[in-house]
Each structure stands twice: as C-alpha cells, then as structure tokens.
C-alpha cells in the first residue's frame, strides 16, 4: 500500500491539531473519503454522458449514489474507495482520450496521469490498470479501425506515444507517494501484485452458511457476493443490455462502450486466473462495480428509448428504475450509520443473510455500541474503572471519549473464548462467529444481552453485561481442578442462561473428570446443538464417544470437523486414537503423522505414535518418534 490517501489526510489532521485518540480525526477521515466517493459518482455520471446522453448520466449517478455498499464504504474505507476513485477517473479520461484520439486534450492527459498515479499510490493494483487500459484502448481502437476503415486513424506507435505520457507520469507520481516503492519501483510493484495473488493471510469467513478459509474460497464467491448485495436496478440494467444489444451498439459510440466493457470484465478474468484470497465480500473490487454502473445505465437508457419508440409515456423507463431504487434508498435512510450492511431481496435482505454471510465485517457498529453504553450511563467522566472486552478492539478503543478513556480497560477476546478472562461489559461483532451457532440460538439470545445493534431488526452486534458470575466461577474452578465447585457453578449458569453452549461444554468437561462419560456426552451433545461447528465441542464429544467405545460416531464427527478445520492437531490426534483403539493401525499411523505435522511440539502426538508403531512392529518409525519426543 502507498500513501496516496493517508498522506494528505495525515497532513490535514496535523494542521488541525487532531491526535489519534480524537474522535474528530475519524470524522475528518470520513469527510475526506466522502469527497472521493462524491467524485466517483461524478465520474460515473460523466462516463454515462459520453456513452449515451444526460439521461444516461443521471441513471448512472443515481444507481451508484443509492448503492448502499458503495455509499457506506465511502465514509469508512480508506483503501477501496480511493482506489475506485482513481480507477474510474482513469477510465473516464482514457475514454476521452480515445474519443479525441486525433488530437487529445492536455487536460485529459493530465487527468489520466493524476488518476493513474493516485490509484497506484493507494494500491499496487494500479499497476495492473496500466496493462488493462492498454488492452481496453486497443480493443476500442481496433473496433474503430475495423468499422470505419479510415486511413486517418493513428497507428499503434502513435497511440503508444499518446498514452506514454500519462502512463509514465502516473507511474512516477504513484511511486512518489509510496515511500517503500521508491527503493526499487519496478520490482516492488510487481512483488506487491504477486503478494495480492497469493495473499499470505488466511482468515475464517462465513459464506453460504459455512465457515471457510479466505485462501480457499470457491470461484462462486465473488459473483455470489455481488449478486446479493448490489441494487436490483444494477443487475436489471446489465441484463437489459442483452435484448437491446443492437440498439446500444448501433447508437454508439461503440468503440467507447467496448473499451469500458473490457475495463469492466478484465478484473473478473484476473480473479479467475490468479485465484487470490478473498474476504469481506467484494469491497476489494469496488472499482469493478463502479465501472459497471455506467454500463447498467446504458441498459436503462436503451429501455427508455424503446419505450419512447413505442409512443408510450416517456417517463415509464425512469419511473421503473426509480421504483427499483426505492428499496436500497429506504435501507440507507433507516440504517444511515452503517448502510453498507446491505443485502438485496434475492437473498431475503439482511435477515436472509443472517448466519449465512458476514454482516458488519468492518466493525462499524462498535461506535453505536460505545454510544449506547454512554446513553445508559455506563461510560462517563465519573465512572468507576471497568474491563470492556470485545472482538473488535480497534473500533471500540478509538471511539472512547477522552474524559473517561483512562477508566476503561479494553481487552480483546474471541467470542468463543469470552469466559477466559473476567470482564464487566462486552461488545461482540458477529464477524468470525459460526453461522450455525447464530441461527441455532437466534443470536444474541443470551441472558447477558444488554442491547443489540440491529439493521432492519436483524442483529449485527451486541452489548453484553457480566450478569451472574456462575460461568466465570465455573470455568475458573474447572481450570484449578475444583471439580465439584465447577459442576455446581455451571449447573447454576445453565439454569440462568440455558443456551450457553460454552457452559454446557465446560460442564461436560467437569463431569468427565468424575468418570461419568454418559452424562458428559449429553452435555457435549447439547453444546453441539447450539454450536454445531465449535471445534472444542466436537473434540470433547469425540473423546466421550471413544471412552464409551463408540468409535464410528467419534470418527464421523472428527472427519466432518477436519473438512473445515484441517489444521486442528487435536482433531487428527483423536482420529488417530479412535482408529488405534479400534485396531485400524494403518489409518492410526496415517493420522498420527498428520498430527505431528500440524503441530510438531505436541508431546501426546509423539507418545501415541510410539505406541502405534510398536504395535505395528515398525520399530524403526517407533524409534524416530521416540527420538523426536526426547528432543522436545
């Protein structure tokens, strides 16, 4: 990443005397991003004007402005919105250069230079634009030459000269705003593109109701996310191009339309070829969406012209478009704090996406949660010190007011590990939660729920209060080996909060310490009822089944878990143990080797391996495991 946006934003904040802990800093950044978003809407409208007419320009601007995902990100996203601004601005100016290719205007060349450089300074994908724009330009030029057969058209060499200035200038400008790239501009830009193609971070994401790794998403990930989160008017506009294809391309300017179409489709081709890691829906491809909006507007303009040709009322086309835009507009008005949490009617709105797709993946609702704690008198200048735990620490920490910030100890914890530490209040964002758990308990159904943050009545985050301390005391007693106390506390917790799957798991673990595996199993089954994909619950369920001699059920549960969590050393270990107990030594050997590959310092894995290979009569591999164990 470069500093195309961060540098001017930081300089302006410094001039205004804003520090990192000031709320005003975040307001300033929101305003600057909104300005870039407004210019992006303007660019979309201008492209629509050059592809059709002023009505087409209005259609494009309307669709983009009332796109909840785009509008929401235009206030919060310091990477994808600046990049979309640079990308669409570059598309506009390259279309203008192509339109006036015989004598390009200097203002268009300068505009392309600035937008290309700005996009490159924000994200290395700007370098990809250099190649893509050449491809798009040649596509438009080739079509123009083919259709007109005009000897007046410039040769490819002249085109290279025309584009050489903005391309070279844009590259230099972009690198100047990217301090890291100044060391070795060419190689570092290429390196960053390679990193994007094979993104090294793999996080858990919710897609189609299943937890996946961002590095292993299917090819349907991007088209699915786009189709269920854009306004229906956008989809309809693209579909309208099909029946009115001849009208659109006959009316022209055909070469400009082809050029923009290449810019629109090329990113999809890149994703299919490079297969990069994807997460957070399509926010990384906001530039792709904004490029497609003028094309969708072309479809609506062609439909409106067809209506007029039929001598029907000329307002029918705009009214139909307007009616389709009512639904996203109402969503924006109702949820102006976080309009980007939007799903269209194809998936049943936000309620249909609940537990199936990530909702507030940016964690914006932490602001509303902090402000709710202020309204309820929890956070104020004269408050007593508290511990506030959250799974989105940055958003919470940076919205605490200065007058009480030093009295709030903000701690990070995963939602599934929320009882590993003591806390007074908690703010939980639904991101990274198991969708099956959210739907099973109708999250947040906890007795500790103090206030849910909702979008169209669907919760996206929740404030918890500590409430009764049963589960905290029970977990502490379990960890310290005070089993009878743990059982008492956890039984009280389940009476207080029946759907607390962690309490059921802890109680099962406590009862298992007494040797009552039947009762322990019942608690693990209840835990899985409320959290079917909880790894620890699955493993404890399998342990209980193994101890009861039901190896087939244990293996089935572990195999299903390992399909999603293939790096679970515990899963592989108990799968090996189940097969070992059942006498399936070959499979046990295979799984125990996988165990120590996943976690090489796991002593029980090496110990079980010794037993397996000794029973197989394979003393050589038993000695290898024995030697490795001695080195730990």
Go through the PLM ranges and name each one.
Residues 1-8, 14-21, 118, 122, ...:
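Transmembrane-lumen/periplasm boundary regions of multi-pass, lipid-linked membrane glycan transferases
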Residues 31-51, 89-93:
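Transmembrane-helix motifs of polytopic, lipid-linked glycan transferases
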Residues 60-65, 92, 116, 120:
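Short helix- or helix-capping micro-motifs
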Residues 75-82:
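Short acidic/glycine- and proline-prone juxtamembrane loop motifs at membrane-interface regions
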Residues 83-100, 111-115, 264, 291-298:
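Specific aromatic-rich, kink-prone transmembrane helix
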Residues 90-108, 143-147, 565:
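Membrane-interface transmembrane helices that cradle and orient dolichyl/undecaprenyl
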Residues 142-150, 294-319:
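Cytosolic-side transmembrane helix boundary signature
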Residues 350-632:
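C-terminal luminal/periplasmic domains and tails of membrane-associated envelope-modifying transferases
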């Amino acid at each position: 990443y470069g500093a195309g946006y961060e540098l001017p934003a930081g300089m302006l904040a410094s001039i205004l005397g804003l520090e990192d802990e000031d709320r005003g800093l975040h307001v300033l950044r929101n305003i600057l991003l909104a300005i870039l978003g407004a210019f992006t809407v303007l660019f979309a409208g201008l492209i629509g004007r050059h592809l059709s007419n002023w009505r087409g320009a209005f259609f494009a601007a309307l669709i983009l402005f009332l796109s909840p995902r785009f509008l929401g990100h235009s206030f919060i996203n310091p990477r994808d919105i600046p990049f979309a601004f640079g990308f669409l601005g570059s598309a506009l100016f390259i279309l203008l250069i192509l339109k006036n290719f015989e004598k390009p205007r200097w203002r268009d060349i300068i505009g392309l230079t600035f937008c290309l450089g700005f996009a490159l300074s924000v994200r290395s994908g700007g370098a990809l634009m250099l190649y893509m724009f050449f491809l798009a330009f040649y596509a438009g030029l080739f079509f123009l030459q083919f259709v007109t057969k005009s000897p007046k058209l410039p040769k490819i060499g002249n085109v290279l000269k025309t584009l050489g200035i903005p391309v070279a200038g844009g590259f230099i400008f972009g690198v100047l705003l990217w301090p890291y790239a100044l060391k070795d501009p060419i190689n570092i830009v290429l390196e960053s593109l390679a990193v994007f193609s094979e993104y090294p971070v793999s996080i858990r994401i919710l897609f189609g109701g299943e937890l996946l790794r961002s590095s292993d998403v299917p090819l349907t990930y991007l088209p699915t996310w786009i189709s269920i989160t854009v306004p229906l008017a956008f989809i309809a506009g693209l579909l309208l191009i099909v029946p009115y294809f001849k009208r659109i391309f006959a009316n022209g300017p055909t070469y400009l339309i082809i050029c923009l179409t290449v810019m629109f489709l090329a990113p999809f081709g890149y994703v299919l070829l490079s297969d990069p890691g994807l997460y957070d829906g399509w926010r990384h491809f906001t530039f792709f969406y904004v490029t497609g909006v003028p094309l969708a507007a072309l479809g609506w303009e062609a439909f409106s012209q067809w209506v007029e040709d039929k001598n029907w009322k000329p307002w029918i086309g705009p009214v139909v478009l307007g009616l389709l835009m009512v639904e996203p507009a109402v969503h924006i008005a109702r949820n102006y704090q976080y309009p980007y949490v939007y799903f269209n009617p194809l998936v049943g709105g936000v309620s249909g996406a609940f537990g199936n797709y990530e909702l507030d993946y940016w964690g914006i609702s932490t602001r509303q949660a902090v402000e709710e704690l202020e309204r309820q008198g929890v956070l104020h200048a004269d408050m007593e010190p508290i511990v506030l735990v959250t799974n989105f620490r940055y958003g919470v920490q940076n919205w605490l007011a200065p007058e009480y910030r030093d009295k709030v100890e903000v701690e990070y914890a995963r939602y599934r590990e929320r009882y590993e530490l003591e806390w007074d209040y908690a703010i939980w964002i639904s991101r990274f939660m198991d969708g099956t758990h959210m739907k099973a308990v109708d999250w947040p159904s906890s007795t500790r729920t103090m206030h849910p943050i909702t979008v169209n009545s669907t919760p996206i985050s929740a404030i918890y209060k500590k409430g009764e301390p049963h589960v905290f005391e029970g977990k502490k007693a379990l960890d310290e080996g005070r089993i009878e106390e743990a059982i008492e506390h956890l039984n009280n917790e389940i009476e207080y909060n029946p759907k607390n799957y962690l309490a059921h798991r802890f109680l099962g673990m406590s009862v298992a310490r007494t040797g009552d595996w039947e009762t322990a199993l019942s608690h693990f089954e209840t835990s899985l009822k409320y959290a079917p994909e909880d790894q620890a619950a699955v493993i404890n369920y399998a342990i209980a089944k193994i101890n009861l001699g039901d190896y087939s059920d244990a293996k089935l549960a572990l195999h299903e878990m390992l399909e999603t969590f293939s790096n679970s050393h515990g899963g592989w270990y108990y799968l090996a143990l189940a097969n070992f107990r059942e006498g399936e030594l070959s499979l046990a050997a295979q799984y125990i080797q996988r165990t120590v590959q996943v976690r090489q310092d796991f002593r029980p894995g090496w110990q079980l391996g010794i037993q397996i290979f000794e029973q197989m009569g394979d003393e050589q591999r038993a000695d290898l495991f024995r030697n490795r164990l001695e080195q730990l």
